[in-house]
């Protein structure tokens, strides 16, 4: 007690004593430093937990933690969109990949995903809007350019590289699939997902849609995703992973760049729907109907 008397002095209450004590410059600095250390540790723990990966997780679940992981999976040819429901270890064993090496690469990848793009925690309505604004827009903007360049190199180089006609056939298949697919999402499925979100916010049960349950259009969308995914795989195989031949001109190079970027965008597009938006929409509908 004599120490406390010496430390605090003679003041009326312990609140005043503590305030005066912490007001001293030394203790203010110590308190501020302790607070910074605590916040830093919380941030480190958040990113450690966010990027914790188990071999038994599905590849879709892994990319859902951080969409930046997609570029590592792309490098190893791991299908995380249409094949996102397969476990990571199963894919590694099937394709003779070093699981430990890939996990190390994933965990050492710089955090590229800002809070604005933490898709796993997006509001479902906002995620649907994001898919339309970013990925549907990307498809519609790039189709005319790919049409122009791909048809051009088929005319100029098709005789020496007949595989280009197979590329064109598969590209036209995925193009038509997407041009029919996107309006179904924009006009039927996504508006219903918005209604589910609004119903949850207002604590009411949503009216049953004419298609019965959200599972029905989702099942159709996933089948169409599979078709588009198969066509892009065929394109990658026909082009030997977009490898340019020795006689490739600038138009050839631009075409392959456009096709590869189209494929990468489609992979993320399908991942956001198959592995995040669709499962959560199904769970939300079931929760609201069973409430």
Predicted segments with their positions:
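Extreme N-terminal basic, low-complexity initiation segments
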Residues: 1-10
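Short hydrophobic targeting helices and cationic amphipathic motifs
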Residues: 4, 20-22, 27-28, 32-33
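General helical secondary-structure elements
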Residues: 10, 24-25, 221, 232
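Polybasic, lysine-rich low-complexity intrinsically disordered segments
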Residues: 17, 35-37, 43, 50
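Small-residue-biased structural context
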Residues: 44-291
């Amino acid at each position: 007690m004599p120490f406390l008397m010496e430390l605090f002095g003679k003041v009326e209450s312990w609140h005043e004593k503590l305030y005066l004590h912490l007001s001293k410059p030394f203790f203010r600095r110590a308190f501020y430093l302790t607070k910074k250390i605590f916040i830093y540790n919380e941030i480190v723990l958040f990113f450690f937990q966010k990027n914790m990966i188990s071999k038994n997780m599905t590849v879709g679940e892994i990319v859902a933690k951080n969409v930046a992981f997609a570029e590592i999976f792309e490098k190893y040819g791991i299908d995380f969109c249409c094949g996102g429901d397969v476990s990571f270890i199963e894919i590694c064993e099937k394709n003779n990949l070093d699981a430990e090496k890939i996990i190390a690469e994933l965990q050492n990848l710089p955090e590229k995903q800002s809070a604005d793009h933490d898709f796993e925690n997006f509001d479902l309505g906002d995620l649907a809007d994001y898919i339309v604004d970013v990925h549907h827009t990307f498809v519609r903007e790039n189709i005319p350019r790919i049409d122009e360049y791909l048809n051009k190199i088929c005319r100029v180089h098709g005789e020496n590289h007949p595989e280009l006609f197979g590329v064109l056939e598969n590209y036209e298949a995925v193009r038509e699939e997407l041009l029919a697919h996107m309006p179904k999402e924009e006009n039927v499925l996504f508006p219903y997902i918005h209604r589910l979100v609004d119903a949850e916010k207002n604590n009411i049960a949503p009216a049953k849609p004419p298609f019965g349950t959200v599972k029905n259009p989702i099942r159709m969308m996933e089948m169409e995703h599979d078709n588009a995914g198969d066509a892009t795989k065929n394109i990658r195989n026909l082009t030997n992973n977009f490898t340019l031949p020795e006689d490739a001109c600038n138009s050839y190079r631009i075409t392959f760049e456009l096709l590869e970027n189209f494929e990468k965008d489609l992979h993320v597009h399908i991942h956001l729907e198959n592995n995040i938006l669709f499962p959560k929409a199904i769970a939300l509908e079931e929760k609201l109907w069973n409430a």
